[in-house]
């Protein structure tokens, strides 16, 4: 009988004496412990890069932003809404830098409703402009996960099978006001192969846990603004494609940008096909632009899917910038600073190595600090030491 309570509560073992994880420094601060948690999260993301795994390179992502009254809380400065919109501006820039042939859209949910801030588009300027304007938005009412997901699904379910369909929810509230059973909607999302991930700003919510688990997404709750930015950065890289997703050759067009001057007698001003959208912010009649090589329809920006013939229009640099996702840089080997016998300076920033651990490239054997290690894997995608060893052609 005495052993029974112990067996029934065995699952609670991971939550016993959690205060022992926290350690104070000389001044009584817990900052060092929190920084250690964030540091381990950075390293984990480097190791989680999917080498030689088929990825969803062409992505369609809807970001759902909670616009309820809880976004006025000031635990993030100056408040949750302003902090979120600023971080999303950074996220949009990074997203299109790493995924130039992908598209993104933004949905805001408040007062039990959902409305589109921007449609799915490959134009980062359009999204950033809308995010800047949304700073003046009033936050009130409760969010509706059901209405937000339904709105995103209505667009995503029509996307081609070879593209990834994703939803990222920034959820501040602890409640959701839905018109119907959200668990039925989760089953529909799973059938439509839409991956839903959630970043919580308050605490873990049961329905979000089920939503992320059933659709193959992730669910995290932020610690602070720095951790918030890290969690958003986690969604910049393309996710692994599911084994059931279609695999097919994609026909693409590579239009050249045509520039015509007013002195050219043959030049005729024309509208961009983007003007088919009533809310388009593109300029009016223009002389130049990108002309579809198949049907000669005109567009002001790339990448885009031709509204006339359906051809995907991109530029060669767009594909080149997507290439590194297929062959990611291997993780550097972590070594204790005491065990490392080489120079005590980082090869990347030339700073003195002071951390407990250093990181060595397994190919060129050069050593890096943790910040350069994360920068090389998240932004540079190639080892500076390995590139330096490549001989320069004699003709240059």
From Swiss-Prot:
It is found in: Nucleus. Pfam families: C1_4, Ssl1. SUPFAM superfamilies: Cysteine-rich domain, vWA-like. A zinc finger (C4-type) spans 292-309. GO terms for biological process: nucleotide-excision repair; transcription by RNA polymerase II. The modification Phosphotyrosine is found at residue 95. CDD domains: vWA_transcription_factor_IIH_type. Residues 60-236 form the VWFA domain. One of its GO terms (cellular component) is nucleus. The keyword Zinc-finger applies. GO terms for molecular function: zinc ion binding. Keywords: DNA damage, DNA repair, Metal-binding, Nucleus, Phosphoprotein, Transcription, Transcription regulation, Zinc, Zinc-finger. It comes from the Eukaryota. Belongs to the GTF2H2 family. Component of the TFIID-containing RNA polymerase II pre-initiation complex that is composed of TBP and at least GTF2A1, GTF2A2, GTF2E1, GTF2E2, GTF2F1, GTF2H2, GTF2H3, GTF2H4, GTF2H5, GTF2B, TCEA1, ERCC2 and ERCC3. Component of the 7-subunit TFIIH core complex composed of XPB/ERCC3, XPD/ERCC2, GTF2H1, GTF2H2, GTF2H3, GTF2H4 and GTF2H5, which is active in NER. The core complex associates with the 3-subunit CDK-activating kinase (CAK) module composed of CCNH/cyclin H, CDK7 and MNAT1 to form the 10-subunit holoenzyme (holo-TFIIH) active in transcription. Component of the general transcription and DNA repair factor IIH (TFIIH) core complex, which is involved in general and transcription-coupled nucleotide excision repair (NER) of damaged DNA and, when complexed to CAK, in RNA transcription by RNA polymerase II. In NER, TFIIH acts by opening DNA around the lesion to allow the excision of the damaged oligonucleotide and its replacement by a new DNA fragment. In transcription, TFIIH has an essential role in transcription initiation. This is General transcription factor IIH subunit 2. It comes from Mus musculus (Mouse). The lineage of its organism: Eukaryota, Metazoa, Chordata, Craniata, Vertebrata.
């Amino acid at each position: 009988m005495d052993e029974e309570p112990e067996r029934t509560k065995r699952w609670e073992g991971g939550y016993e004496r959690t205060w022992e994880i926290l350690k104070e420094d000389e001044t009584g601060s817990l900052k060092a412990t929190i920084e250690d948690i964030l540091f381990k999260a950075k390293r984990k993301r480097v190791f989680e890069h999917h080498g030689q795994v088929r990825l969803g390179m062409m992505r369609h992502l809807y970001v759902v932003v909670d616009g309820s009254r809880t976004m006025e809380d000031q635990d993030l400065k100056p408040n949750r809404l302003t902090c979120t919109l600023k971080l999303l501006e950074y996220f949009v820039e990074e997203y299109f830098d790493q995924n130039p042939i992908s598209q993104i859209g933004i949905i805001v949910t408040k007062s039990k409703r959902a409305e589109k801030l921007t449609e799915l588009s490959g134009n980062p300027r359009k999204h950033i402009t809308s995010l800047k304007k949304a700073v003046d938005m009033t936050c009130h009412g409760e969010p509706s996960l059901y209405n937000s997901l339904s709105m995103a699904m209505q667009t995503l379910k029509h996307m081609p099978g070879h593209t990834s369909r994703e939803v990222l929810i920034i959820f501040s509230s602890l409640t959701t006001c839905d018109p119907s059973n959200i668990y039925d909607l989760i089953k529909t999302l799973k059938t439509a192969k839409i991956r839903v991930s959630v970043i919580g700003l308050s605490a873990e919510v049961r329905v979000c846990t089920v939503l992320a688990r059933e659709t193959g997404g992730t669910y995290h709750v932020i610690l602070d603004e720095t951790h918030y930015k890290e969690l958003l950065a986690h969604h910049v890289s393309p996710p692994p494609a599911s084994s059931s997703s279609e695999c097919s050759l994609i026909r693409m067009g590579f239009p050249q940008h045509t520039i015509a001057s007013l002195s050219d007698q043959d030049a005729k001003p024309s509208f961009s096909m983007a003007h088919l959208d009533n809310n388009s912010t593109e300029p009016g009649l223009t002389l130049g632009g990108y002309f579809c090589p198949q049907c000669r329809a005109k567009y002001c920006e790339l990448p885009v899917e031709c509204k006339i013939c359906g051809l995907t229009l991109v530029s060669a640099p767009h594909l080149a910038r997507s290439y590194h996702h297929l062959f990611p840089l291997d993780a550097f080997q972590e070594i204790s600073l005491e065990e490392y016998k080489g120079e005590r300076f980082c090869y990347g920033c030339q700073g003195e190595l002071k951390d407990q651990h250093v990181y060595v490239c397994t190919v060129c054997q050069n050593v890096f600090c943790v910040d350069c290690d994360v920068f090389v894997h998240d932004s540079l995608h190639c080892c500076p030491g390995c590139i330096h060893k490549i001989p320069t052609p004699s003709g240059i």
